[in-house]
Amino acid sequence: MATATLTIDLDAIAANWRALDQMTASDCQTGAVVKADAYGLGAAKVAHALARAGARRFFVAACEEGAEVRRALGSGPQICVFSGHMEGDTALIRDFDLTPMLNSIEQLTRHFETLGGQPFGLQLDSGMNRLGLEPGEWEAVAATALEAGPELLMSHLACADEPDHPMNTEQLRAFRAMTDGTGVPRSLSATGGILLGPAWHFELTRPGIGLYGGRPFEEARPVVHLSLPVVQVREVEIGEPVGYSNSWTAEHTSTIATVAAGYADGLPRTLSSRASLFAGRVPCPLVGRVSMDLITVDVSHLPEVPDALDILCRHQTPDDLADTAGTIGYEILTSLGRRYQRRYGALAA
């Protein structure tokens, strides 16, 4: 079989949610971010696992994602949409009982005119300059918006993965200035904000990457294992090239395994001749270019070539691979290709 196997540990995701939930006070609700197909791991199955663990409020990027999660979970849990109420979203918000996080005066107007009485939340810009009402805009519409009864006031931290960054305190101060005294539940923190401490928690947190085993939640249980099948093995003599552009040449007689995965499957080309795959605990260097469907790996030092090599495992996390590729673990996870056979179960010890 030439299809790689991506194993996803739903119990580990649930355990990570519970661990993050325990970091906050009992009167602080812990939500769950399942946008981008639950960071590439399957929103329907992940949302089910998180709901069983106790999550009651889910966050997605767009209404179409919210509809998928609602189909999976049925009625009950609240599903909040970060992009708010865009033009064309009205039917989805109504039919799938979604809660848009309105982030502009235009969206406020659209929502009140088309879905008056439908639950909504508000995003406020505390300094990231990405989404949300700016302080001046909020001051102008706060009385009207609060009278309509928002479910949540939220903002987002720009530098939460850097605990000592002054922006964290600046945004906390700005958020409090906009929301103190409103009497509405508030949310400022995703995973990084949870780790900053109780001052950033308010009434609701929204962990995302920490659920899926990523930094900055260093104590997270690993969630994914990606095993790539070996398609062919050949002996390469001294001076012979491997792969596109002859970018790697054998300096000694080498055993090269051609493995079924490439940039079409989410492996960045920047891994070319830089990354390692693993045979058990033994690292094996990737040699030559990452191509669309294939990579080549030097397995000369192995006593026997296995049927598959691991690229995500206990010895190389998504963050580790991201460091090698010059990116972040979020990108590695969300780029995991559709060709992988997804298997849900416990990871091998």
Swiss-Prot record:
Pathway: Amino-acid biosynthesis; D-alanine biosynthesis; D-alanine from L-alanine: step 1/1. Substrate binds at R130, M292. Pfam families: Ala_racemase_C, Ala_racemase_N. The active site is at K35 (proton acceptor), Y244 (proton acceptor). The modification N6-(pyridoxal phosphate)lysine is found at K35. One of its GO terms (molecular function) is alanine racemase activity. Its cofactor is pyridoxal 5'-phosphate. PROSITE patterns: ALANINE_RACEMASE. InterPro entries: Ala_racemase (IPR000821), Ala_racemase/Decarboxylase_C (IPR009006), Ala_racemase_C (IPR011079), Ala_racemase_N (IPR001608), Ala_racemase_pyridoxalP-BS (IPR020622), PLP-binding_barrel (IPR029066). One of its GO terms (cellular component) is cytosol. It catalyses: L-alanine = D-alanine. NCBIfam families: alr. PANTHER family: ALANINE RACEMASE (PTHR30511), ALANINE RACEMASE, CATABOLIC-RELATED (PTHR30511:SF0). Belongs to the alanine racemase family. Catalyzes the interconversion of L-alanine and D-alanine. May also act on other amino acids. This is Alanine racemase. It comes from Cereibacter sphaeroides (strain ATCC 17025 / ATH 2.4.3).
